[in-house]
Amino acid sequence: LKTDIKPVGKSPSGVNIYSFQYKDMEGTYEGVMAHEVPWASMMNDNGYYMVDYSKLDVEFKKLN
């Protein structure tokens, strides 16, 4: 689960980009919200959505 979600911009194609933290992980990350990119999202076996960043013009990044 993501926490501390903050908008940081948009990709060239208009996809919203956010910074966020994961509840059970250290660090801050940058990426998208799966519900905003259904063409690039899938549900994993645990019931959480995952994003296939190869279908987007956004790079998933660990900021710190």
Task: List the predicted regions and their residue ranges.
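C-terminal intramolecular chaperone/autoprocessing and neck/assembly modules of extracellular spikes
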Residues: L1-N64
